[in-house]
């Protein structure tokens, strides 16, 4: 008994695209017994991954049952935790949930400015015993292959799964069981780039690779590989950015003027909608740290959500549903302190909430989360304590810098008592000289 993902189990002999000798015929391979010509054009199925290209022949594709996972951040490893990583497929039991993710190295292309851009790879899932590594045993160390299996699967035997026929079977949008931790820096095709940050079931209700949406090419003037490729959207986006004078690979330079505009734009939002960053710090958005706002310290106060440690904390943030339905809410009217006295006063309310976020040591990244929390919870108390222990000396009004600070510092002695400006008592010799100075002057007339 063989299983078909997305369908009820069926026999291998039921495949309508197989010849009598049991060899699978791909849609782009020549088959004289079938007429696929329509108005001079030939239908071509979408390729999901390719194997090696034989000399003198077309690229033979291996069709995955699922949509791909694309990397969008360099330097991120593709990996799943043990027991995770096998996509959900109706009709496939847990005992057959085993296989591998295959890295498809996409080609580079030339942008409008003449530079070569290498597209980041895309990964596709194949059941054990199928795809480009059908003959390899589970767990074999192969570059570009990551093995995954459920806890109920026997990895010593191939999965009893039919190969996908793109002419009759559409690709299934990739999604995982609840609790699956997706690789960071990757997104599921069609699910948006927020998918890697979600620890719950991936929301990949997206476009599926469909045999009905076939790329058309002129049979007389074009080769079979000249249709629309999965990389064309990235190429078009890069060409548009190049025409606009922007480079998608280079970060935009932030000037003082743009930083001021960004900060003002953030501050114009309601307080609960602000996201502090490098241009608008935590203190500018929410005020100084204290007993009521006791989170943040060091670099996180400067960088806000731009801090490299913040994304792992965002995993703990509640959803809107959890906020409203999992918290104790209280509505209170407060005094309006904004606006001028001559302006009409507005009624101001506060929706106060009290709740908790519960997690345990099995949470992915638990040690890092605890480290970041311990460094930032009540960090203002440590900063205030350091300021009280070593206060900056205050200079008195009218006193020059350095005056009165070091009274015991020895200096060079003056050259004379006059420079010292010190008084002393007169000696007998001094008094005698003063008396002589007071006597009238008489000319000496004695002769020699």
From Swiss-Prot:
Biased amino acid composition, Low complexity: 9-22, 193-214
Domain CoV N NTD residue range list: 61-190
Polar residues composition-biased segments: 29-38, 45-55, 399-409
Domain of life: Viruses
Keywords, sorted A to Z: ADP-ribosylation, Host Golgi apparatus, Phosphoprotein, Ribonucleoprotein, RNA-binding, Transcription, Transcription regulation, Viral nucleoprotein, Virion
GO MF, any single term: RNA binding
Spans annotated as Dimerization: 266-384
Spans annotated as Disordered: 1-55, 157-231, 266-298, 385-448
Ranges of biased composition (kind: Basic residues): 266-276
Protein purpose: Packages the positive strand viral genome RNA into a helical ribonucleocapsid (RNP) and plays a fundamental role during virion assembly through its interactions with the viral genome and membrane protein M. Plays an important role in enhancing the efficiency of subgenomic viral RNA transcription as well as viral replication.
Subunit: Homooligomer. Both monomeric and oligomeric forms interact with RNA. Interacts with protein M. Interacts with NSP3; this interaction serves to tether the genome to the newly translated replicase-transcriptase complex at a very early stage of infection.
Stated family: Belongs to the betacoronavirus nucleocapsid protein family.
Protein name per Swiss-Prot or TrEMBL: Nucleoprotein
Organism name: Bovine coronavirus (strain LY-138)
Gene name in the database record: N
């Amino acid at each position: 008994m063989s299983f078909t993902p997305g369908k009820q189990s069926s026999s291998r002999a039921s495949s309508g695209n197989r010849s009598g000798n049991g060899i699978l015929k791909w849609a782009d391979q020549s088959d004289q017994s079938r007429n696929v010509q329509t108005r001079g054009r030939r239908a071509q199925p979408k390729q999901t991954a390719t194997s090696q290209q034989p000399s003198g022949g077309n690229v033979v594709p291996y069709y995955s049952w699922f949509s791909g996972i694309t990397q969008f951040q360099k330097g991120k490893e593709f990996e799943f935790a043990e027991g995770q990583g096998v996509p959900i497929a109706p009709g496939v039991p847990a005992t057959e949930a085993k296989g591998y993710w295959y890295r498809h190295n996409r080609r580079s292309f030339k942008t409008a400015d003449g530079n070569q851009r290498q597209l980041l790879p895309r990964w596709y899932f194949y059941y054990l015993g199928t795809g480009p590594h059908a003959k390899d045993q589970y767990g074999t160390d192969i570059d570009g292959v990551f093995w995954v299996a459920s806890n109920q699967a026997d990895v010593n035997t191939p999965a009893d799964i039919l190969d996908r026929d793109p002419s009759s079977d559409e690709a299934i949008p990739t999604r995982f069981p609840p609790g699956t931790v997706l690789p960071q820096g990757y997104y599921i095709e069609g699910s948006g780039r927020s998918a890697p940050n979600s620890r719950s079931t991936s929301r990949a209700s997206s476009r599926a690779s469909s045999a009905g949406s076939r790329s058309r090419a002129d049979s007389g003037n074009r080769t079979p590989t000249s249709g629309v490729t999965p990389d064309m959207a990235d190429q078009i986006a890069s060409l548009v950015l190049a025409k606009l004078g922007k480079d998608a690979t280079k970060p935009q330079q932030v000037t003082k003027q743009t930083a001021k505009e960004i900060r003002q734009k953030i501050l114009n939002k309601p307080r609960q909608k602000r996201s502090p960053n490098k241009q608008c710090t935590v203190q500018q958005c929410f005020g100084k740290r204290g007993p009521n706002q006791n989170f943040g310290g060091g670099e996180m106060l400067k960088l806000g959500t731009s801090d490299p440690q913040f994304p792992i904390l965002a995993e703990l943030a509640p959803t809107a549903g959890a906020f409203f339905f999992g918290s104790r809410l209280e509505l209170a009217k407060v005094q309006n302190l904004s606006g001028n006295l001559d302006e009409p006063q507005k009624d101001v309310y506060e929706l106060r909430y009290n709740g908790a976020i519960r997690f345990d040591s099995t949470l992915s990244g638990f040690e890092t989360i605890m480290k970041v929390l311990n460094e930032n919870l009540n960090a203002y108390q440590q900063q205030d304590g350091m300021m009280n222990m070593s206060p900056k000396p205050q200079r008195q009004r009218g006193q020059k810098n350095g005056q009165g600070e070091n009274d015991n510092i020895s200096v060079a002695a003056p050259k004379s008592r006059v420079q010292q400006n010190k008084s002393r008592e007169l000696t007998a010799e001094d008094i005698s000289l003063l008396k002589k100075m007071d006597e009238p002057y008489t000319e000496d007339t004695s002769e020699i």
